[in-house]
């Protein structure tokens, strides 16, 4: 976590659907709270307004802010409102239905009328890659650049703005999955690409696939929000790094949250 200046103001901001709350803590222990109306859809404007108001009320200047901490439910809202990025999935041949197969567990075992929620990536945007990582870590047949290029062309035609990559047994060969993801980034500039092993190189194809899909689904939304918020804070005179609260209670630089940890930002978020 980036270091903060102790002899300066520390500001914490939390955004809700109705109000945006900011608390400024001075170097002398003084606390200045501020509440303003939230500003959807540009919620960052409310954060900047509340921060500026709190610091001004304290008789300080934005340049005296030594730490800027932020909790946000932008990713949660994108999932609940089905307002995330159009996402594609790249997986091993024969495994594109893993999102729908899931696990045996279901929330209402005896409810005959229960319907499984539709996956965030429909079947038409799930692409199968030839090649296979086996249980011993060997790759046979290999994932060729030609096959990756073929899938990239299909993804480009689907209109997807984000891509999740999850290959079977990739936790044994993280380098192989990352290579495929890097090739897709090169072939699909401007798309948000997630490799499942970058979130958790662990066994469990359904868990890794669904987590990578959620990360890609909300990633562009979170990235755009945090980029705009950082820009507006700097314009207002707050130049310290923006730190975002994670589901584990820790803080992460906003640049890393937007890049590869979108699905775990904010304290009320849990991996899906």
Which residues fall in each region the model found?
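N-terminally biased helix-coil "hinge/interface" segments that flank
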Residues: 2-272
